[in-house]
Protein backbone atom coordinates (compact mmCIF):
# COMPACT_ATOMS: atom_id res chain seq x y z
CA UNK A 1 0.00 0.00 0.00
CA UNK A 2 1.34 3.40 -0.97
CA UNK A 3 2.01 6.17 1.50
CA UNK A 4 -0.78 8.20 -0.11
CA UNK A 5 -3.22 5.29 0.33
CA UNK A 6 -2.34 4.95 3.99
CA UNK A 7 -2.78 8.68 4.63
CA UNK A 8 -6.12 8.77 2.78
CA UNK A 9 -7.43 5.75 4.70
CA UNK A 10 -6.31 7.22 8.03
CA UNK A 11 -7.95 10.56 7.24
CA UNK A 12 -11.23 8.98 6.10
CA UNK A 13 -11.35 6.73 9.16
CA UNK A 14 -10.79 9.69 11.45
CA UNK A 15 -13.14 12.15 9.73
CA UNK A 16 -16.02 9.70 9.24
CA UNK A 17 -15.45 7.99 12.59
CA UNK A 18 -15.27 4.48 11.13
CA UNK A 19 -12.87 1.61 11.75
CA UNK A 20 -9.91 1.52 9.37
CA UNK A 21 -10.90 -2.05 8.46
CA UNK A 22 -14.12 -0.64 6.92
CA UNK A 23 -12.19 1.81 4.73
CA UNK A 24 -11.49 -0.42 1.73
CA UNK A 25 -10.76 0.70 -1.82
CA UNK A 26 -14.28 -0.34 -2.85
CA UNK A 27 -16.01 1.38 0.09
CA UNK A 28 -18.52 3.98 -1.09
CA UNK A 29 -18.56 7.09 1.10
CA UNK A 30 -22.36 7.25 1.29
CA UNK A 31 -23.45 3.62 1.00
CA UNK A 32 -20.71 1.90 3.01
CA UNK A 33 -19.21 4.55 5.28
CA UNK A 34 -22.35 6.50 6.19
CA UNK A 35 -21.24 9.87 4.82
CA UNK A 36 -23.87 12.38 3.77
CA UNK A 37 -23.26 14.99 1.07
CA UNK A 38 -21.86 17.52 3.56
CA UNK A 39 -19.49 14.90 5.01
CA UNK A 40 -18.26 14.15 1.51
CA UNK A 41 -17.65 17.82 0.69
CA UNK A 42 -15.77 18.30 3.97
CA UNK A 43 -13.76 15.14 3.32
CA UNK A 44 -12.73 16.38 -0.14
CA UNK A 45 -11.66 19.69 1.41
CA UNK A 46 -9.66 17.85 4.08
CA UNK A 47 -7.94 15.76 1.40
CA UNK A 48 -7.09 18.90 -0.59
CA UNK A 49 -5.53 20.42 2.52
CA UNK A 50 -3.72 17.23 3.59
CA UNK A 51 -2.10 16.81 0.17
CA UNK A 52 -1.52 20.51 -0.61
CA UNK A 53 -3.76 20.30 -3.65
CA UNK A 54 -5.55 23.06 -5.51
CA UNK A 55 -9.32 22.87 -5.01
CA UNK A 56 -10.78 19.93 -6.89
CA UNK A 57 -13.28 21.17 -9.50
CA UNK A 58 -16.89 20.34 -8.64
CA UNK A 59 -17.42 18.19 -11.74
CA UNK A 60 -14.40 16.09 -10.74
CA UNK A 61 -15.22 15.95 -7.02
CA UNK A 62 -18.70 14.52 -7.61
CA UNK A 63 -17.06 11.61 -9.45
CA UNK A 64 -15.11 10.70 -6.28
CA UNK A 65 -17.52 8.24 -4.68
CA UNK A 66 -15.25 5.57 -3.23
CA UNK A 67 -12.03 5.41 -1.25
CA UNK A 68 -10.32 4.02 -4.35
CA UNK A 69 -11.58 6.97 -6.42
CA UNK A 70 -10.09 9.41 -3.91
CA UNK A 71 -6.74 7.64 -3.81
CA UNK A 72 -6.55 7.39 -7.62
CA UNK A 73 -7.39 11.08 -8.02
CA UNK A 74 -4.79 12.18 -5.48
CA UNK A 75 -2.10 9.88 -6.88
CA UNK A 76 -2.69 11.05 -10.47
CA UNK A 77 -2.62 14.71 -9.52
CA UNK A 78 0.41 14.25 -7.27
CA UNK A 79 2.18 12.65 -10.25
CA UNK A 80 1.13 15.53 -12.53
CA UNK A 81 2.49 18.08 -10.06
CA UNK A 82 5.75 16.14 -9.78
CA UNK A 83 6.23 16.05 -13.56
CA UNK A 84 5.60 19.81 -13.85
CA UNK A 85 8.35 20.59 -11.33
From Swiss-Prot:
Q: Read off the InterPro entries from this record.
A: ACP (IPR003231), ACP-like_sf (IPR036736), PP-bd_ACP (IPR009081)
> Listed GO molecular functions?
acyl binding; acyl carrier activity
A GO cellular component annotation in the UniProt record: cytosol
Residues of the Carrier domain: 2-78
Q: Where in the cell is it found?
A: Cytoplasm
Alphabetic keyword roster: Cytoplasm, Fatty acid biosynthesis, Fatty acid metabolism, Lipid biosynthesis, Lipid metabolism, Phosphopantetheine, Phosphoprotein
Residues with the O-(pantetheine 4'-phosphoryl)serine modification: 37
Family matches, as HAMAP family = Acyl_carrier
Family, per the entry? Belongs to the acyl carrier protein (ACP) family.
Q: What does this protein do?
A: Carrier of the growing fatty acid chain in fatty acid biosynthesis.
| Full protein name | Acyl carrier protein
- Species of origin reads Azobacteroides pseudotrichonymphae genomovar. CFP2
Amino acid sequence: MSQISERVIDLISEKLNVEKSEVTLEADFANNLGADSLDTVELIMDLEKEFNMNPIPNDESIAIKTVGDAIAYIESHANEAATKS
